[in-house]
Amino acid sequence: MDPYTVAIIKKLGIEEQVETAATKSPFIEGLANGTAPPGAFKRWLYEDRIYVQGCSLCLAKAINAITHEKGFPKEALDLFLGAYNVITPELAHFEARCKESNVEMPKLKPVPTSWEQALQDNKPEEYYHLSAPDCKSYIQFMTQELFEIPGTSGIDYFMAFYLNEVIYHRAWKFVRESKQFQKNCPEEMEFVKWWGQPSFGKFVENLARSIQDVPFTSATVDIAKKICNFEYRFFSTAFEKA
């Protein structure tokens, strides 16, 4: 991990939780050591597509909150705005790759092209029924419950999204570096190479650097721990049924 991310995780006191969420779930460990059952990866891709739909709304809500918060670092806001703007092209690449690999995808509306539109048109209740229980509960937290926690502010919403990215990148970098995975899973590697690429790691680093001087609260720590737990469980949707 980059030094900025290491510093934040240490400050939050969640070093062990992050590593467990990223590399200790049965799904990620199974991919890395060659014991994941057939079909698990494709099953997880289906759930991941649903989660991205929900996470885009979380990002839109976070942007909306941060834009109204005096003194929040402009660099952090700009990174969030950039993150929202790349969702559509990223999904186009992802869905094209899934089609090439005969991966079933859920029937979803396009992600709204602007975060302002997402606040109006992205309705998680329209796709809850498509998702596995742990995916649904994660989306509910990221799009609704997170923003209802008393006393929270922009740094808490930023942290929720940021840690999601940290764990995601750490997990797939871990899988990508596995010799067993490299040998046994050439088709899956095409997805994993995309997620583990250096540019994604740089994005995570930039997010961390942008909030180095923003103070955390006890709510920030609690939310960070919740995200670690949700991420660990979300990887297990590879073994669930919607």
From Swiss-Prot:
Major localization class: cytoplasm
Highest taxon listed in the record's lineage: Eukaryota
Subcellular location: Cytoplasm; Nucleus
Database matches in Gene3D superfamilies: Heme oxygenase-like
Keywords from the UniProt entry: Cytoplasm, Nucleus
MF terms (GO), sorted A to Z: catalytic activity
The protein's name in its UniProt record: Uncharacterized protein C530.07c
